[in-house]
């Protein structure tokens, strides 16, 4: 399901959005390792590519991974897609790729019945907060922020609380 996206100036850009394969897992891990994002095990990225490919998106330029979204639809919330992580290569930052990745996810057939998108974000992660608020604004819907995981739940002392950002409902 390769999708070439049209750039803001009307030209077709060279970024292709697709479902990931297990081979993409290592590249996702490497991208996160070289960023400020929380690095999960390499197994997590490979597993997401294998078992949740329908709800994950990779962005490639010249066959090189430049961004991704890992997400899933929780079994008890079939109207919600939960975004675990959004990663964008430094070469693509500030170009709207994260927004395009989220929109590519929401346009997938698997998200046909999705009315909400959720993600957890730390209070200090202003870039992610802005990304999800912008998504809500562009889709003309609401953002609700609520407490999710408090600091005391995390075994390491450096982890901030995680807030749930719930965007929706979406209209089709």
From Swiss-Prot:
**Quick one: which pathway?**
Amine and polyamine biosynthesis; ectoine biosynthesis; L-ectoine from L-aspartate 4-semialdehyde: step 2/3
Q: Which UniProt keywords apply?
A: Acyltransferase, Transferase
Q: Which GO terms describe its molecular function?
A: diaminobutyrate acetyltransferase activity
Claim: Acyltransferase is one of the keywords in the record: yes
| Matching Pfam families | Acetyltransf_1
Show where the N-acetyltransferase domain sits: 15-166
Enzyme Commission code(s) on record: 2.3.1.178
What are the recorded Gene Ontology BP terms? ectoine biosynthetic process
* Family according to the record: Belongs to the acetyltransferase family. EctA subfamily.
Q: State what protein this is by name.
A: L-2,4-diaminobutyric acid acetyltransferase
Native organism is: Marinococcus halophilus
